[in-house]
Regions:
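Nucleic-acid substrate recognition interfaces
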Residues: 1-171
Length: 171
């Protein structure tokens, strides 16, 4: 199958032109779940790489090509990773924070993880929460000329809404 189909559990309409979806994904196959989680980890890594590259003065056009080659993901995902990286940088600058000290996945959780007194289940739970925030990002914008979002698209299969995910590498 070229595109992964995921069951959609909830949706929320933001206005008449666009749909914002908040959902819990339920997977029919563990293989599908693994592939989507891999895509999310790659995308999260792309955002962090783009952020560091922007700090070092990289240009968007060159960075977009580099990200696509390095991670084996299409340029739409690369462009969106660059957008998120720029938004993170702007947010740091607006908040008068040092952009070089940004911690992806929440500084607060990271600082708690660094404490030596945490052990066992509480540490594992905290680490899982931090990793979900750090690696659990997937963002893709739609395009009017392409009639919506080609990477993430809602489809109705047998009266059930599903999310079709383009894995970014032609699958």
């Amino acid at each position: 199958m070229n595109k992964e189909v995921l069951k959609m559990l909830t949706e929320k309409k933001s206005n008449s032109n666009f749909v914002t979806v908040e959902c819990l994904l339920a997977f029919d196959k563990d293989e599908d779940k693994g592939r989507v989680l891999t895509l999310m980890r790659k995308f999260s890594s792309m955002v962090r790489f783009a952020y560091k590259s922007i700090l070092h003065g990289a240009e968007r056009k060159e960075l977009k090509k580099l990200l696509s080659r390095k991670y084996g993901i299409n340029t739409r995902y690369s462009d969106d990773a660059i957008l998120l990286a720029k938004q993170n940088l702007e947010s740091c600058l607006e908040g008068n924070q040092n952009p070089k000290k940004l911690v992806f996945g929440s500084r607060e959780l990271f600082e708690q993880l660094k404490k030596k007194h945490l052990a066992g289940k509480s540490r594992d739970t905290l680490r899982q929460k931090w990793e979900e925030r750090r690696y659990g990002i997937l963002y893709s914008r739609g395009d009017k000329s392409r009639e919506g979002n080609l990477n993430l698209r809602l489809v109705n299969l047998n009266n059930q809404w599903c999310l079709r995910v383009n894995l970014g590498n032609g699958e």
